[in-house]
Amino acid sequence: MGDYLVKALAYDGQVRACAARTTETVGEAPRRHQTWPTASAALGRALTAGSMMGAMLKGDETLTIKIDGGGPIGTILVDSNAKGEVRGYVTNPHVHFELNEHGKLDVARAVGKNGMLTFVKDLGLRDFFTGQVPIISGELGEDFTYYFASSEQVPSSVGVGVLVNPDHTILAAGGFILQLMPGTEEKTIDQIERRLQTIPPVSRMVESGLTPEEILEELLGKGNVKVLETLPVAFVCRCSRERIADALISLGAQEIQDIIDKEGYAEASCHFCNETYHFTKEELKQLKQLADAKKA
């Protein structure tokens, strides 16, 4: 079963819901960035939340999430879009601690609680939509929940989880977002709250083989969920050799000549996917000609 998410309504439209399986997507974190387990869990939770929040967008709209809690992990940055594509990185990938008192990876200690959670949505308008809230727990699920309630005024529950194997690969990852629509009945809220208190962690549900549809049934009850859309989820980076070449051209002919004289080659790495692009002296000379032509 590949990674995917489902968008759904429940309780006759009173609840908007999304659930995702992101095991392979999150698995790109240790593969691309050599993240240690606690860092993998933190970045994986952010990637999972980003994929689900991106799925709430439309068309070519995009979302950037910046998590900076002042902890040893540094900054987590995640980009996502409406197509189920997500990418991300963490400033300090080599962070790992002993399990916390609950027997889980200590994401809160890695992320920290002295900072902000920032969301930037590019909706294709003149200005970006920006929302920012203080980080209240560092576990991220609670922090995303607080963002929805505080910045978007939507009562929500967000759960994200990652299980890491002893060899640092990803065993299971996934998440859910539940949102109450205006006018939701009290009995519906009570039922959901009771279920949230009794269900296993979402990462354990994914590990046991539950699909996103089945996770929503665990959360909301069988027969209450109406799936609206299914969307593949994947780690996809928008970087390319052409984009890096354009960036070099934008430096100008003189700057490119300086690189040729001093280094004889150019090398650039993408923060998001860790892909490295190499340009030989001959290729740089061609880019210099293009920069000259552009200036003319």
UniProtKB/Swiss-Prot annotation:
Under oxidizing conditions two disulfide bonds are formed involving the reactive cysteines. Under reducing conditions zinc is bound to the reactive cysteines and the protein is inactive. Pfam families: HSP33 (PF01430). Keywords: Chaperone, Cytoplasm, Disulfide bond, Redox-active center, Zinc. Disulfide bonds join C237-C239, C270-C273. SUPFAM superfamilies: Hsp33 domain, HSP33 redox switch-like. One of its GO terms (molecular function) is protein folding chaperone. GO terms for cellular component: cytoplasm. One of its GO terms (biological process) is protein refolding. Belongs to the HSP33 family. NCBIfam families: PRK00114.1. HAMAP family: HslO. Redox regulated molecular chaperone. Protects both thermally unfolding and oxidatively damaged proteins from irreversible aggregation. Plays an important role in the bacterial defense system toward oxidative stress. This is 33 kDa chaperonin. It comes from Geobacillus stearothermophilus. The lineage of its organism: Bacteria, Bacillati, Bacillota, Bacilli, Bacillales.
